[in-house]
Amino acid sequence: MKSLPFPSPSRDLAGDSAQSLLLAARLHAPGSYLGIHSVPGGELVRVFQPYMSRVWLQTSSGFQVMECTHDAGIFEWKGEAVTRPYLLRLEHAETGVIEERYDPYAFPVQISGHDLYLFNEGRLLQAYHMLGTHQVKNQGVTGTRFAVWAPNAERVSVVGDFNHWDGRVCPMMARDHSGVWELFIPDLPGGTLYKYEIRNHSTGEILLKTDPYATRYELRPNNAALTPVESRYEWQDNDWMVQRAGWDWLHAPVNIYELHVGSWKRHPDGSFYSYQELADHLIPYLQEMGYSHVELLPISEHPLDESWGYQVTGYFAATSRYGNPEAFMYFVDKCHQAGIGVILDWVPAHFPQDSFSLARFDGTALYEHEDPRLGYHQDWGTYIFNYGRSEVKSFLLSSAHYWLSVFHIDGLRVDAVASMLYLDYSRKEGEWLPNRFGGRENLDAIDFLRELNTMVHGEFSGALTFAEESTSWPAVSRPTYLGGLGFSMKWNMGWMNDTLNYMQLDPIHRHYHHNELTFNQLYAYTENFILPLSHDEVVHGKKSLLDKMSGDVWQMFANLRLLFTYQMTCPGKKINFMGNEFAQGREWRVNHELDWYLLERDPHRGIQMLLRNLNHLYLDTPALHELDFFTEGFSWIDCHDSEQSVISYQRRARDGSFMLVILNFTPVPRTGYRVGVPESRTYQEVFNSDSTYYGGSNIGNPGDIVPTGQQWSGQVDSIIITLPPLAGIILI
């Protein structure tokens, strides 16, 4: 190919203005200056390589030297038609090393206008396929496509070790008026560190930001993203996924073990278990203990261990603390093969102020509101998402979709829903702005939550959503077409607070607070409730569950056994935080593993054995789970015996089978206690929390319990039993 005389840069397509903008790192449209352009007499190729001493262009005649037209590193070549894409040969100025690579500006953009339109409309539910980084082929060449949303930027560049973190070298292409920037960089290996350098168009502020859509980040405290490595993981959970799709979860047992990966167990040197090690140690434990699901506190990437994962900076990335994405896939897959579902805590309510992440991403309030009365969470020092902005909605919906799709997650526990629903949440008069109707409801957040639940239940059969919602907002777990928010279940914070308040009372005072045990049944079927004893109740000076219990040491353990018996027999699905199951003595400490050594002591082993037996009884007994959400599944036998602090009730299954539960909340054994029964037949005691196996005094009812023929408490017959102290019994 014949080389032609160079035109003056001031007379070609872009001219001096574009050159000056490029060198000042302000070039908004790099494709107008860099790359290949038609000029009189042929084509012009222009590249910017400030760290190279010489550059050659591959032509049909071989590699030809490009002329350095500016000592800052601008090289040009003009000649006849150039093959697309074209290869460059580069000599590094410092080392003299020569390498060959394709020019990023030789390739066209790839993202379709239709996808950009859907993203801007808030209807691109898989935006992670468009934005972020992807290993793709462009004109037959393998490379990494970068795309980021930054509508208020004058210039956005990809920076990393590969270009000396120099924002002048790889400026991105602005995609029309979508606010999206795109660039294809050929031959960039997976695992390459990168960020986006953004120049705000109004202020000129330069920001260095990590990729909001990245799927991998380097290990904290560093925070650069990594280009993706093609996943070769082969899932083995097809049987689970097929079974889940037809799962009747309304009538199924759901018993969740809530877990923080970094503090469940650690190696002797204090290092974390990897995702693979967690699978090897946790799954057998979950099976032995009788849990149907494990819920992980947020494993989305986050910079600070002490945040427990709730201040997320990577909404599409499993944290690198415990391994890579394929390792997390392995964990989920192994759970599924063992019959264990995996639920993730997911945090769409707020995000941290860290300057490298979402906060004022392009120099403006992009993901958050500009007005702090809408956009700043005073309690947590975080920013509140702008749910009314379509692109933010696409971002959050796509994050949920990503976890459920890519990682086969079985459900999302949505954190802090109450803070999303109310504009005046934790705010004084004058610190919040009303909605367009003058009310306190966050209408945009409500619409977002409904869209979230519609998407999850419509696209992921059998997947569940759980709302941590602490107010009396109606119909949280009712379908959106009936005006509800559409969640599968709602945390029953009222039951939790009333129950824990009651259990902390000295038994001598409990008869004055009997309504705290019975009030729950007035609203128990207004929602699909799950009964939580969660991490929030065992930190920040609230004390461990064991330490909350009243009385001396024996009574504290007896009260805890009684609490678990009450929880596991009450209507509603179940969730317990790690450590509760063996009576962790101290509050949860995020930087230490649980106090597993306590299992060397009989009372703690007794609590673990009790909860294991209760869990399996719950899983195996339809009367304890089939009608959790229906009035037909529960009826009081006697809720009025406040003087003796005793309650009794029956749980029923769809086939009419039932169990009787009698709970004594005082340390006084009660002999000759009469209980009404719904059928005149013999009964047996199948569970007693006062058993010596669990550390109790072994007071109970061995053998058959025969009916007396006397009606009682509105029942057709009655039995005479012995009630053990601070204990519950179950009869069939």
Curated annotation (Swiss-Prot):
Question: Which SMART domains does the UniProt record give?
Answer: Aamy
Q: Please give the GO cellular component terms listed in this UniProt entry.
A: cytosol
The protein's annotated catalytic reaction(s) are: Transfers a segment of a (1->4)-alpha-D-glucan chain to a primary hydroxy group in a similar glucan chain
Return the similarity comment: Belongs to the glycosyl hydrolase 13 family. GlgB subfamily.
Any one Pfam family match given in the protein's UniProt record, by short name = Alpha-amylase
Pathway(s) it belongs to: Glycan biosynthesis; glycogen biosynthesis
Active-site residues per Swiss-Prot or TrEMBL entry: 415, 468
Q: What is its EC number?
A: 2.4.1.18
Q: List the InterPro entries.
A: A-amylase/branching_C (IPR006048), Branching_enzy (IPR037439), GlgB (IPR006407), GlgB_N (IPR054169), GlgB_N_E_set_prok (IPR044143), Glyco_hydro_13_cat_dom (IPR006047), Glyco_hydro_13_N (IPR004193), Glyco_hydro_b (IPR013780)
What stretches pass through the bilayer?
none
Enumerate the PANTHER family for this protein. 1,4-ALPHA-GLUCAN-BRANCHING ENZYME (PTHR43651:SF3)
Q: What does this protein do?
A: Catalyzes the formation of the alpha-1,6-glucosidic linkages in glycogen by scission of a 1,4-alpha-linked oligosaccharide from growing alpha-1,4-glucan chains and the subsequent attachment of the oligosaccharide to the alpha-1,6 position.
> Quaternary structure per UniProt?
Monomer.
Q: Matching Gene3D superfamilies, A to Z?
A: Glycosidases (3.20.20.80), Golgi alpha-mannosidase II (2.60.40.1180), Immunoglobulins (2.60.40.10)
Q: What is this protein called?
A: 1,4-alpha-glucan branching enzyme GlgB
Q: What GO molecular function annotation could you give as one example from this UniProt entry?
A: hydrolase activity, hydrolyzing O-glycosyl compounds
Which is a GO BP term held by this UniProt record?
glycogen biosynthetic process
Species name for this entry?
Nitrosomonas eutropha (strain DSM 101675 / C91 / Nm57)
Q: Sorted alphabetically, which keywords does the UniProt record give? A: Carbohydrate metabolism, Glycogen biosynthesis, Glycogen metabolism, Glycosyltransferase, Transferase
